[in-house]
Amino acid sequence: MSEVINVNCPTCGKAVVWGEISPFRPFCCKRCQLIDLGEWAAEEKRIPSEGGLSDSDDWSEELK
């Protein structure tokens, strides 16, 4: 018999079974999934970086 793995929904904290029974995992529902997506889209969440971009990084919006 396999062990049931439970995780907490990152949005609301509700327990979620990690398996096919939970189609929105790690979220408990579509609503929590969309709340999280909205936070990423609004840049309320981000992956931390060690440094910023500088002018010498050859990033340009100009067409060549």
Curated annotation (Swiss-Prot):
One Pfam family of this chain: YacG
Essential cofactor(s): Zn(2+)
Biological processes per GO annotation: regulation of DNA-templated transcription
Cofactor note: Binds 1 zinc ion.
MF (Gene Ontology): DNA topoisomerase type II (double strand cut, ATP-hydrolyzing) inhibitor activity; zinc ion binding
Protein role: Inhibits all the catalytic activities of DNA gyrase by preventing its interaction with DNA. Acts by binding directly to the C-terminal domain of GyrB, which probably disrupts DNA binding by the gyrase.
Family: Belongs to the DNA gyrase inhibitor YacG family.
NCBIfam families: PRK00418.1
Name the record gives this protein: DNA gyrase inhibitor YacG
